[in-house]
């Protein structure tokens, strides 16, 4: 199954862009950081702008992230660019735990494509360079 999707690179001229969103990050008080629901369009708006080359991104160990000021906050009185920056922060310890969990998950597969383990190893290395 994994290999089928990896092989698409050779079969499709214009591959789709892939984005990952965690709508459920919590702050130090256990509350959701992102307002959610109807405000999700703000992130989707950034994704469309990114795909159209209208906005840039910041490189991180987990991929490219929006500049906080590129997320439209019009009409959100209780949500600031600083809140967006907090939401976009990459917690090294959390991600190292995530990588360890993924490594354990990968052990369940007997025919896992090498490309997946290579990508995970590369991400692990990017985090190691930050320490």
Show which residues each predicted segment covers:
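Flexible, glycine-rich loop/tail regions that form catalytic "lids" or insertion modules at the edges
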Residues: 1-131
